[in-house]
C-alpha cells in the first residue's frame, strides 16, 4: 500500500496540461465523467498497442534494409529479434503501466477531495471537497503536425514544407461548481532508438547494420485552473485546444481577463488528512 501511494505521489509533480464540445451538465454528471475517463484510458491502450512493432514488422524492415547482403541480413535479423524479445521480457517484469494508468485515473476521479494544490506563494490548499460536484466535462483535442522537409542544393539552399494535420483526443477537462477546471491528459514523447548488429564477411570487410526504431512514451498529467466564476466548459476546451495546437495563448489569456484565472499545481494527495495552509475556497 505504501508503494502504491508512493507511485501516485511520484507521478503528480510532473504535472502539466494537455474538441469535443460539451453541452449542459447531465443529471448523473459524476458517473458520466467517470465513464468518459475509463474510455480515455482504454483509448490510451490502443495508442500503445499501435506504437509497438511486432516481430514480423521488425523482420520486414531488416529484410528491406539489408536485401543486398543476405548473410548480414540474417545476422541483423537475429539481433533485432533478440532485442525485441529482451524488451518484452523487461516490460513484463515491471509493473503493468497500462493497469497503473487506469488505476490512477480512476483514483483521481474517485478521490477529488484528496487533491492538494499549490497556490501562488507556495500555500497548500484543498479546493475540491465532496460538496464540490462535477459540473461538466469534455474531451481535449490537439492538432498534430507532420512536417516533411525536402532540402535542395542549388545556388541557395532552401526548404519545402509539406504539412499533414491530424486531430486526436489527448485528454479530458472537468469543471466543478466552485470554478475549478481540472485537466487530465496524456503526453506522447517520441524517442528514436538505434539497435545495431555487426558481422564480418568472408572478404574481411566489417559491416554494421543499424535499425532505427521510434518508441512512443505516454504519461499521465494533471493540471488545475481556478476561476472566480464557473462558465461553460466548451469555452475552456476551445481555448486550450487553440493554445496547444497553434502555440497561441490569446484565447487562454482572454479567459483570465474575463474570469480571473489562477493556475494551480497539484502537488500531493492528502493521504493522512494532514492539515493544509488554507481552507477550501
Swiss-Prot record:
Compositionally biased residues, Basic and acidic residues: 150-161
Region named Disordered: 145-165
Lipid-conjugated positions (S-diacylglycerol cysteine): 24
Membrane topology: Lipid-anchor
N-palmitoyl cysteine lipid attachment residues: 24
Localization of this protein: Cell membrane
Source organism superkingdom: Bacteria
Signal sequence coordinates: 1-23
Example of a GO cellular component annotation carried by this entry: plasma membrane
Keywords, ordered alphabetically: Cell membrane, Lipoprotein, Membrane, Palmitate, Signal
PROSITE patterns per the UniProt record, alphabetical: PROKAR_LIPOPROTEIN
Segments forming a coiled coil: none
Main localization (coarse): membrane
Name of the protein in question: Uncharacterized lipoprotein MG149
Organism of origin: Mycoplasma genitalium (strain ATCC 33530 / DSM 19775 / NCTC 10195 / G37)
Amino acid at each position: 500500500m505504501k508503494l502504491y501511494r508512493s507511485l501516485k505521489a511520484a507521478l503528480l509533480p510532473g504535472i502539466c496540461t494537455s474538441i469535443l464540445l460539451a453541452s449542459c451538465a447531465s443529471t448523473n454528471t459524476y458517473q458520466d465523467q467517470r465513464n468518459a475517463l475509463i474510455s480515455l484510458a482504454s483509448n490510451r491502450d490502443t495508442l500503445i498497442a499501435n506504437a509497438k512493432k511486432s516481430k514480423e514488422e521488425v523482420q520486414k524492415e531488416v529484410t528491406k534494409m539489408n536485401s543486398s547482403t543476405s548473410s548480414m541480413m540474417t545476422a541483423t535479423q537475429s539481433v533485432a529479434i533478440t532485442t525485441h524479445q529482451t524488451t518484452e521480457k523487461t516490460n513484463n517484469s515491471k509493473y503493468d503501466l497500462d493497469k497503473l494508468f487506469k488505476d490512477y485515473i480512476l483514483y483521481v476521479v474517485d478521490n477529488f477531495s484528496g487533491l492538494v494544490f499549490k497556490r501562488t506563494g507556495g500555500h497548500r490548499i484543498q479546493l475540491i471537497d465532496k460538496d464540490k460536484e462535477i459540473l461538466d466535462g469534455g474531451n481535449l483535442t490537439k492538432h498534430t503536425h507532420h512536417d516533411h522537409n525536402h532540402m535542395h542544393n542549388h545556388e541557395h539552399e532552401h526548404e519545402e514544407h509539406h504539412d499533414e494535420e491530424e486531430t486526436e483526443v489527448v485528454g479530458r477537462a472537468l469543471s466543478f461548481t466552485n470554478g475549478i477546471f481540472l485537466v487530465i491528459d496524456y503526453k506522447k514523447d517520441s524517442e528514436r532508438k538505434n539497435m545495431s548488429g555487426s558481422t564480418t564477411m568472408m572478404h574481411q570487410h566489417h559491416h554494421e547494420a543499424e535499425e532505427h526504431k521510434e518508441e512512443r512514451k505516454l504519461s499521465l498529467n494533471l493540471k488545475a485552473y481556478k476561476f472566480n466564476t464557473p462558465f461553460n466548459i466548451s469555452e475552456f476546451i476551445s481555448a486550450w485546444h487553440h493554445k496547444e495546437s497553434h502555440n497561441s495563448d490569446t484565447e487562454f489569456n482572454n479567459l483570465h481577463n474575463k474570469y480571473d484565472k489562477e493556475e494551480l499545481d497539484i502537488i500531493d494527495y492528502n493521504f493522512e488528512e494532514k492539515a493544509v495552509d488554507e481552507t477550501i475556497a
